[in-house]
């Protein structure tokens, strides 16, 4: 994103990251952090599409909506309804962090 490096170096990084994500069989969970106030940004939609293009049956994408303290109750309910398996968090008031920790442990360690 914001690194001041040559275009060639960025392409090398992209290639290496792409290979790592696609070939690493030990990855069981991708955690996709999304700003809860901006749920349909192109960057998030593109990442979702990219991950789904190579997701294996034993892998999962967990959508985590951040900054939920900035939403009212009706906006939170709408978000939960639209994204059933997502987790809503707020670092400011620590909302949802226990749920996130539990889900990451469950998905990665099976506990």
Annotate each language-model stretch with its function.
Residues 67-111:
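Canonical P-loop GTPase G-domain recognition
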Residues 10-14, 45, 94-97:
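Amphipathic alpha-helical transducer elements in NTP-driven molecular machines
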Residues 5, 35-36, 92:
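Structured loop/turn residues at secondary-structure junctions
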Residues 1-16:
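Switch II (G3) loop of P-loop NTPases
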Residues 14-85:
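Conserved C-terminal guanine-recognition region of P-loop GTPase G domains, centered on the G4
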Residues 1-5, 41, 72-73, 96:
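Conserved protein kinase catalytic core
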């Amino acid at each position: 994103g914001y690194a001041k490096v040559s275009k060639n170096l960025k392409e090398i990084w992209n290639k290496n990251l792409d290979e790592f994500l696609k070939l690493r069989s030990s990855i069981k969970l991708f955690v996709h952090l999304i700003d809860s106030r901006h749920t349909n940004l192109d960057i998030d939609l593109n990442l979702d599409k990219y991950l789904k293009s190579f997701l294996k049956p034993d892998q999962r994408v967990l959508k985590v909506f951040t900054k939920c303290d900035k939403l009212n109750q009706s906006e939170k309910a709408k978000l939960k309804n639209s994204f059933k398996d997502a987790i809503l968090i707020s670092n400011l008031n620590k909302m949802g962090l226990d749920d996130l920790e539990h889900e990451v442990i469950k998905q990665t360690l099976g506990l």
